[in-house]
Amino acid sequence: MRAIISLILISAMVFSMIAAVPEEEGLQLSEDERGGCLPHNRFCNALSGPRCCSGLRCKELSIWDSRCLG
């Protein structure tokens, strides 16, 4: 019986924490990210999008790190 009550209380606490964060707040993107281009010094992938903004190129700094640089 205690286990069931504890499970219900924990579920209610988790639900209240999830409901406390507005959905729009977690989904907001900057105009550049929404438009598909990345600003200076952001991670990029030279083979597939999103692409760097105009004047920038995706430069491979190491095997695991590529960034939009001028």
Curated annotation (Swiss-Prot):
One of its GO terms (molecular function) is toxin activity. Keywords: Amidation, Disulfide bond, Knottin, Neurotoxin, Secreted, Signal, Toxin. It comes from the Eukaryota. Residues 21-34 form a propeptide. Disulfide bonds join 37-53, 44-58, 52-68. It holds the Pfam family Toxin_7. Its main location: secreted. The keyword Metal-binding does not apply. Residues 1-20 form the signal peptide. One of its GO terms (cellular component) is extracellular region. Expressed by the venom gland. It is found in: Secreted. The modification Leucine amide is found at residue 69. The presence of a 'disulfide through disulfide knot' structurally defines this protein as a knottin. Insect active toxin causing rapid but reversible paralysis in crickets. No activity shown in mammals. Does not show effect on mammalian voltage-gated calcium channels. Belongs to the neurotoxin 01 (U2-agtx) family. This is U2-agatoxin-Ao1b. It comes from Agelena orientalis (Funnel-web spider). The lineage of its organism: Eukaryota, Metazoa, Ecdysozoa, Arthropoda, Chelicerata.
